[in-house]
Amino acid sequence: MAQTNGELEHSKETPEQLTNGNHPEETQEEDNTGGLFQITVKLPHEPYKIQVMVSSQEQVQDVRQSIVELPSTFQYTCFHLEFNGQRINDFVELSEVPDLKADSEITLVEDPYNEKEARMHVVRMRELVGAAGDRVDNLHGISAGLSLHDAISAEVADASEKEHSLSKYDITSSPSLKTILPRAEAPLPKTVKAISLSPWNPVPYHLRQKGHLLYLQVTTNEGEQFQITSHISGFYVNKNSNMKFDPSPKTIPKSGRAHSLLTLIAHLSPSFNASFEALQESNNKKDLLTTFPFQNAIPNNPWLVPPPTSTANAHQPDITRSQENYLISGVDNAETLRDWNEEFQTTRELPRETVQDRVFRERLTSKLFADYNEAAARGAVLVARGEVAPLNPTESRDAQIFVYNNIFYSFGADGVGTFASEGGDEAARVAVGKDVVGIKAVNQLDINGLFTPGTVVVDYLGKRIVGQSIVPGIFKQREPGEHQIDYGGVEGKDVVATHPDFVSVFEKMSKALRVKKHAVWDKEGQRHELEGSVETKGLLGTDGRKYVLDLYRVTPLDVMWQEEEGSDAYPHRMSVLRLELVESYWRHKMSQYVKAEVERRRSAKAEADAAKAESSEATESKEQASEEKSEEDQERVDISGFSLALNPDVCSGQVPQTDEEKEQWAQDEKEVRETCDYLRSKIMPELIQDLHDGDVGFPMDGQSLSQLLHKRGINIRYLGKLAQLSKEKGSRLDALSTLLVQEMIARAFKHIANEYLRNVPAPFVASCISHLLNCLLGADVNPNPVAEIDASLRSIYPEGDFSFEKATPATLRAAIEKQVTIRYRFTLEAEWFNSLRHLQLLRDLSIKLGLQLGAREFIFDKSQIPAKAPATNGANGVAQEEGKNKKKKKGGDSSSPARAAKEEKPILAIVPDDILNIVPLVKDASPRSSLAEEALEAGRISLMQNQKQLGQELILESLSLHEQIYGILHPEVAKLYHQLSMLYYQTDEKEAAVELARKAVIVTERTLGVDSADTILSYLNLSLFEHASGNTKTALAYIKHAMDLWKIIYGANHPDSITTMNNAAVMLQHLKQYSDSRKWFEASLEVCESLFGRQSINTATILFQLAQALALDQDSKGAVGKMRDAYNIFLSQLGPNDRNTKEAETWLEQLTQNAVSIAKHAKDIQARRLRRVNMNPRSLGTKIQPQVGQTAPEVAGARAPGSASLDSRSVDELLKFIEGGDAGSSKAKQKKRAAASNPKLRGSKKSSA
């Protein structure tokens, strides 16, 4: 147990555990040098001593945490540690404790409780004994932070020996939503019936003097109720009853007093110890990561959750649930009130000289941002619901501001007309989103002396809310003539302020963000020199710190986009370029500069050499050495002479006054235009080409598509342009075109839904969303959906906006078409709504709007409507079904229990009851850890330079830093686990690779979602590593799960699934499941042909593998045919001398000879009336071992003439005998294969198109 725990609590345990299996001696050495050692902790109760593995760099509080988490020391929460009789400070590093070394003994000393410690102890004990139910809050939704990994591993363990996970798998079947739902679990053992606060709280004043802190009541499994006093000395049973108050100690036969509540309950309940052990055993079956609490990240909220009727979602009575807020934050809630701004800025001012300083500072920063993001998101939800009183109630709704929990909130709308010329509310909404991105970039730069407010943007119920920490002095009324802002534009661009104190810090910021120093002019025509955009403001806080605000214009406007004529005007003028593009353009220009510089030097050298050619031979040898050196210097170019910075205020209404200024401004504009052109002429075509050639992983859904575009510096507004480029590339990029169009529709729907939702009263939100979804996705089931609205509730909201009721499928489609035209300058095809992929679109929309839907079989198609009487699937059956729905209203109740009450109404694809919850979507400005990233980069470089030992040490150091700074559950840590597992796999340390890949899967599931594209990739990696470690059956289970997820998020035939199917086929061959293996190769071939064409090298490679699979499956006729096809493609594409062509030729000869010998053998057997074929094991068994990776370069080529039919007839005749002579079962199998596999694959191809 201690080890498993350490793995979570102490990052350094992980490497120790990972390398332990492979290099015991090395590890021992490394442990000592790396500062890992073991100490003994002396305890006041059983087991009286424990050993803990610690690191000299960690703090004493980390050791405390280890003790609290260990099963043998669960009961301790209120204690301190002593060494040599001296108390140790919790916040010092172990290396600073005098004389502490390996095998030292420290003592755990129980402390007296105070009220806060007592409350925390009760919360902790409730969690430990399984008495705490789910906390219901407005940030974490249903099943937040879910992981399915354990359930899938368990399924493998339960499966029979002979079966493998893919034995009856149908690649073309429709997706099953059960894939992403938590599996039903056996109820956990119950240790106590209840632990709650007693009605006698709070403690009267006279008893507080005597050390009373809380009164509790505990009901044991035996049904006895005990009233307990929480006292400074511990816990004891008192004489209270429900009617009489007497909190003095009660004398009972058992021991009625203990320092820990856990120990006391064990004394009072005879069954407690056994049930508590059973509970721990049950918990230990799960991977610790799946139950570990979130500390530095917000858990992912799944879009699909079990319905309220399921046991997984059942609501249980628990009186303490409503008392938990008091237990966690005290009577007046003051413990959770923090001065966020002061915390942010003092953390920034912490020292950063040594590595230890930086670790401490970054760790604190990460925790602070996580706490702030969570608190700000909770407050934003309350603001959106109208539960917080505004500071300016007389203003219009959009102009109102709020303060809650020391966080300042405002709406992302143009309440006061600041953005009137830029596009009003639309511009304001975009500006606050860009502001968070800008603040995140500045936080990442970490400039000394420049401060940013804590900032979060929350989208909830159609409203965008900005939460910021309160900058001291921001509300201060200035003297007449003084500006509210100290640097930059004041209330627009009419007045411009400058301040000498801001120049140096803004200069550093602008240099790093590639922003050019430039002049701007106020309304009087007065010139001001600014380091940044006129929109970027500097404020001198009353705390003396320099704050930067409004960072939404750190990059220039996309001039070309604004000038391009669309059929309708773009909604706003905030279409700026992305920071990633500016960075990419800077690198592009720098490489041009370096090349030019090298060329210039070479030509200069050539001239100098020509001049020197006549010099005497005596000096030649001396010169040779200096020449080599100068060549090296020549290749090293000093880039200090290169600079590229862009003016963000170009084309934004600035009016230069003099000719010189106008010339400079024209030059700035030219540079910005070149950047815009670089995006259009280089970045976008390159991305399309990379996807066409298969050089980069293919996006699977809207999220992964957006990430890919943003990484390349492409704005989402270019979806339409990319869709056009993709179409021009032809059918190979059909999958991309489908995704791009789906993303445009989803985003257009989101804008429309937000418009409707903004002023809908809270009880009608589900009705509004379900009605709009029915208009988009359910028009086939019900062409005239009617919104379900409770008329009695409606009358309570006379001012509510119910305009969504008027939406119809036709009006919604027209609105979507208009939004797509305006926002993406793309025209949807005429019947676009008939080719929607309903489930994938529903998932995308749910994620974009924060919906959590109750799982059921959603019906988007008339043919899916369940029939009440035997009816065909044709038109008559549907008509009859509809007729019955209309006439027999009451009779329908019994047939569909999921919607028993709703059957009276016309059938709908989505009903309001399907929308169980709506969660806020949070955009934050948390910076990444630069220290952890530096260590990882240094490790990578060392490995590239073949310094394996140093490289691995640095990488493990980076892992340790990641876990220390971010905590275990964080997307950045998941990413690192993923990268490290690949590194270990490449260095052939398979066990370590599997261990890290497993962690990557669980952390990705819990932070990014059980069906995110990253989760699929993590499962596919894990399956490869499990197979390499010899656990092929487990590997196949992971592949099956990944394929099931793929069907939900993308559908069938994703371009990257070719590789996965091939891997599955090779794994099945490894298990000698030749028949199944062949089916997976055939499926892979089907997808490959549809994407790359019949004559591509990709197709030939798969044909080559399929031929081998057919030979192993005793179908030599098929094998010869496929190998001939492969040979012909290689021959026409690569020529006769290529290695692939020659290999295919050799195989073809062997397989043809084989086919002949089998046919002869079959004839003999038939003559003797034997019913089996004895295949030649030597030629077919041992030689056919297709290696993964027998692939040629990907080239699409011309179609070769049909030379494949060369010898087909003779082979046909020969192989007629095999069919007659083979066992009946084989014949049936072949028929089944011919009938079943191919048509289904064709069908799936059609449906995906």
UniProtKB/Swiss-Prot annotation:
Keywords: Cytoplasm, Repeat, TPR repeat
Keyword Transferase: no
Subcellular location: Cytoplasm
Domain Clu as annotated: residue spans: 318-562
Compositionally biased spans, kind Polar residues: 1176-1190
Cellular component terms (Gene Ontology): cytoplasm
Subunit relationships: May associate with the eukaryotic translation initiation factor 3 (eIF-3) complex.
General function of this protein: mRNA-binding protein involved in proper cytoplasmic distribution of mitochondria.
HAMAP family cross-referenced by the UniProt entry: CLU
Name this polypeptide is given: Clustered mitochondria protein homolog
Organism of this sequence: Aspergillus niger (strain ATCC MYA-4892 / CBS 513.88 / FGSC A1513)
